[in-house]
Amino acid sequence: MASYAPFIKPYVQYNEHGWGPCEIPDMDVPYQPFCKSDRLGKICDWTVAMQEKKFSNKYASSFGNNSQYAYFHEDDDSTFHLVDTSGSRALKPYQRGRFRPNVRNNARVKGRSGRGPGMLGVAGSMAGGGTTSGSTKYGKGRESRRNQGRRFARNAPSRLRESSVLVRPNWVSLEEIEFPRLLKLALPNIKEGQDIVTCGSLEYYDKLYDRINLRNERPLLKMDRIVHTVTTTDDPVIRRLSKTMGNVFATDEILATIMCCTRSNYSWDVVIEKLGTKVFLDKRDNAQFDLLTVNETSLEPPMDEEGSINSAHSLAMEATLINHNFGQQVLRVGEQEPRFKFGEPNPFEEPGVELACLGYRYRQWQLGNDLVLVARCKHNGVIQGPNGEVQFLSIKALNEWDSKAANSVEWRQKLDTQRGAVLASELRNNACKLARWTVEAVLAGSDQLKLGYVSRVTPRDHLRHVILGTQQFKPQEFATQINLNMDNAWGILRCLVDIVMKQPDGKYLIVKDPNKPMVRLYDIPENSFDSDAEDEENSSEPFANSLDN
């Protein structure tokens, strides 16, 4: 019987607490995680080369640990040779005069038309974008500068604006509405407002200011009259009317800000108080809500430089004072001059204080779903129509500060001959402000919107101004010209009011985001904006005080 090899029983480890071997012998083989789908570019690489910038992760591992085995493109310098071009063959005298001017001219024609493969030899290198000195001088230098300007304009970092109010941590965000959603809203068939109470008196417009032109300019005077910008809850007439009629109360400035919010770039805020079925749209005390913006919608808005006369805040103060002085200067002021008086006196009169003559109209609108809006609107003056009728005016002023810095049309050159170009430039740079003025005129029922063109005497003097001309429009027609849809404006207001009506009684705040096209609704405590600390943080001079200085 054949002998068999002896059977040696192997040693088997027994795992009492699981399955598999209890320990792994040390084989001195390094382990590295890998993926079978990775493409191997090299077997090994002892030096790490610079990765390709455009496709740096083309052969990278999905695990990210065995990148030394990935493929990276390397230039082979073994076949690189330097070529000495200093000893190039000179052209013959008879060729130098005929050939080289044609090269330059053909290169220019080739660069302008962009046709053909280019000339051979030196001409081909120049026309085809070569690196000769001639191409750098005539074509490549200008093109690179143009591309550089466009590149920096396109990739320039966006300017971060500050919010009009400091958002507190204890404020609750209720709603965020983007402008594209608001632009789709519409509330048609809103009839013209009905007058409830009319107060104040109006002076007649001086028609001599319609004859002002560039050759007959007139200096802008400083008027000592005071304008009170009383908010909604402090208006005694609105307090009286809120007891018997209406459930939404506001002023024309607040309504215009909300209805034209999709055109605004700067931050603003509106305080809302809900008491039962009544909603009051209000503004914060000592806020910059009443300041007029300058070049808000321009491609290059004013910079926020402290101490500069061309900063955003300084220009806003200047524009507000110009608008106030112009609105009073163009009126026929005097005790012997006639006035148009409304049914009730000015509700904001104070003894010993000379107030500007303004006419206030408290009107109401039916917004549907038992929503009745009551708002205070105003007129700045009156004028006698062609048939002897009285027409109400809304008088506003556009101001020019520095046409070169503002990248706009220079008024002193084109205001008389190309007034349409000047107005188009203002519509581009101040679209939101003009839309607000138009909405205020439409809400008040003004027959005409009178615009004045006021400019600095010199660009560096922000205290002296001259009136260069005036222009008038019908508010409804001007709204059509600037593409202002009143149905959309009413829809935006109705949307925000409906959102607030669904909330419990309390205090709310609508804030325009300073850097995004959206508005936010916050639920804020009742004591917000009441403490002295809040007034110090949001300190700004009241509009009435600024007019006294």
Curated annotation (Swiss-Prot):
User: Where in the cell?
Assistant: Cytoplasm
Region of interest (Disordered), residue spans: 107-157, 527-549
Q: Which InterPro entries match?
A: eIF3d
Q: The organism sits in which domain of life?
A: Eukaryota
Q: Which UniProt keywords apply?
A: Cytoplasm, Initiation factor, Protein biosynthesis, RNA-binding
Q: Name one Pfam family in it.
A: eIF-3_zeta
Segments for region (RNA gate): 288-302
Q: Where is the composition biased (Acidic residues)?
A: 529-539
Q: List, alphabetically, the GO terms of the cellular component aspect.
A: eukaryotic 43S preinitiation complex; eukaryotic 48S preinitiation complex; eukaryotic translation initiation factor 3 complex
Q: Where is the composition biased (Gly residues)?
A: 114-132
GO BP annotations, alphabetical order: cap-dependent translational initiation; formation of cytoplasmic translation initiation complex; regulation of translational initiation
- Main subcellular location: cytoplasm
Under the GO molecular function aspect, what terms does this record hold? mRNA cap binding; translation initiation factor activity
PANTHER family in the cross-refs: EUKARYOTIC TRANSLATION INITIATION FACTOR 3 SUBUNIT 7, EUKARYOTIC TRANSLATION INITIATION FACTOR 3 SUBUNIT D
Query: Partners and quaternary state?
Result: Component of the eukaryotic translation initiation factor 3 (eIF-3) complex. The eIF-3 complex interacts with pix.
Q: Which family does it belong to?
A: Belongs to the eIF-3 subunit D family.
Function, in words: mRNA cap-binding component of the eukaryotic translation initiation factor 3 (eIF-3) complex, which is involved in protein synthesis of a specialized repertoire of mRNAs and, together with other initiation factors, stimulates binding of mRNA and methionyl-tRNAi to the 40S ribosome. The eIF-3 complex specifically targets and initiates translation of a subset of mRNAs involved in cell proliferation. In the eIF-3 complex, eif3d specifically recognizes and binds the 7-methylguanosine cap of a subset of mRNAs.
Q: What domain comment accompanies this record?
A: The RNA gate region regulates mRNA cap recognition to prevent promiscuous mRNA-binding before assembly of eif3d into the full eukaryotic translation initiation factor 3 (eIF-3) complex.
Q: What is this protein called?
A: Eukaryotic translation initiation factor 3 subunit D-2
